[in-house]
Amino acid sequence: MKKISFIAASITLLATTGTADDTTRPNVIVIYTDDQGYGDATCLNKNAKFSTPNIDRLAHEGVLFTDGHCSDTVCTPSRYGLLTGRYSWRTELKRGVFQAERPCLIPDQRMTLASLLRDNGYQTAMVGKWHLGMDFPGTRTTRDWSQPVLDMPLDKGFDYFWGIPASMNYGVLAWFEGRFAKVPPTEYTSKKPNKIALDDYRIMPPYDQSASVKDANAAGNFSGKLEVAPDFSDISCLDRFTTQSIEWMKKRNIDKPFFLYLPYTSPHKPVIPMDRFRGQGQAGAYGEFMIETDWHVGRILDFLEKEGLDENTFILFTSDNGPETTWKKRKELFQHASNGPYREGKRSIYEGGHRVPFIVRWPNGITSPGRTYSSPVCQTDLLATLADMVGAELPKDAGEDSQSFLPALTKAATVNRVPMIHHSSRGEFAIRDTQWKLVMGSTKKRNQELYDLSNDPGETTNLIEKQTERAQALRQKLTHIVRSGRSTKGNAVPNDTPYWDDLFWMTEAEYQQPDRTVQSVEKKTKIHRLASTRRSVFDAFSYINRLPEAPYEDESSEDFSGRIFGRLANQEGRILLKSPPGMS
């Protein structure tokens, strides 16, 4: 009770206030496509079989990063890396992706792009696909959609959420606004054939009133039909997401800067362009879908220009991973290379799996727009970049793998990035340091490969036998980055888990983690729903119990107090004084 009294008293001292330069700080928009390969934009692929004029406009009026990377090679881990500035393999997620329903990979107390900017006077919104886990009321057969969704974007720094929980193949498909579905997903569907695309499916009416449901297994998978709302249709996603984003921006507080995270569902399956785009381009339905995606990007740009917001809005356009395996058939049928000149695609440890479009447009901030930046940059770097931009200092337990690339924008300077770690959906590791890339191989094969990307971007010539000392040095750097809990400067911090098999090149003893007095910052406490307990009360005590209880070994009492106040300010007092955000 002493701790609760202290926190309750502290809340009276907290207030969210704007700063004198709120009206001059840039707005921030992150447009995040799904499975778009490096070669799926004409500014990166002059031989593309379709045109992307609006994406190209971002490049012509901004900076085109030709060596930009996502932090993993599939949806969930890349999204974690983008939002937190930390590699997802440091968490419990070592391989693959999440289902729609499970505890969120981001703990409430971990800093995100949204919480960073909200704490610095921004209004924050997410519109689109989440795919980091949510806590839905009940189970597939016992849903109570009058109850709120928990452990979701509103708990991770976003003031507003409108979108879907995950990829469409994982179900629970409805248009969610805040913590509630606009129309609950009370019907069921199987995947229907998609006759216009390669190896694809559809999610569209008619839907069923019941489904044959089998028990979920330990991994959270299930057999049976997907939960879906009567008004949901796959073909509507891009249009609805763009329209809702524009509506939110129209209703924003014009006296405060805003942050919009817009993760689209394209060109991920189902590949289903609207009729108006059929017949365009020369790459089948996939090309038409990319043309539609580009058109929606243009809608955002047109709105910003109309409202006089385009000059002072920082836009990052990028993708969560390389292209789906259908890239091989597209190359054969249409001579379109979704992976550009790079090896393989989605899920792969090679460049085609994680080198993606990466473009920043910010007229008021970029020096010499229209240029190309050829040094490495990672999506994890966005957190440190935005912190740098707003003049904020990242705490010790945030952005462990994030390095600011702001000088590359504002000064046209080259940033000497620390070694970058790549990670595949199968748990494989690689390390990139300058032009050198060491691929560690799979747990089974353990066939290490070394490539000189400056002379061999297609990763065709393995130099491991000729460059043994260089390979050994890279292995040592990789080991250090893994076990230190961070790749950027700062004291070592622990990862979230003990040793795992994918770290086969080091022993369990070598993995020994740094000690820290308090590890409650990353303690993952699932908030269970209790029928006899009011959600607001239970959430309040659960949140308090996850606050830091003591300072780090090298942390002053002032810094410790500031860390607690920062956590509470991020919640704006709502967790104790009333229901969680989005609940009445």
What annotation goes with each model-predicted range?
Residues 47-52, 69-74, 100-111, 191-193, ...:
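A short beta-strand-to-alpha-helix junction
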Residues 30, 37-126, 132-144, 158, ...:
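Active-site segment of extracytoplasmic enzymes that catalyze sulfate/phosphate-ester chemistry
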Residues 171-172, 176-181, 188, 221, ...:
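Active-site His/acidic residue clusters
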Residues 139-142, 146-168, 183-184, 323-351, ...:
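C-terminal cap/loop subdomain of S1 sulfatases and analogous C-terminal strand-loop tails that border
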Residues 24-29, 61-66, 119-125, 156-159, ...:
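Loop/turn elements at helix/coil->beta-strand transitions in domains of secreted/extracellular proteins
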Residues 21-26, 33, 37-38, 64, ...:
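Long, internal low-complexity/basic segments
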Residues 257-258, 263, 292-330:
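Metal-dependent active-site segment of extracytoplasmic phospho-/sulfohydrolases and closely related
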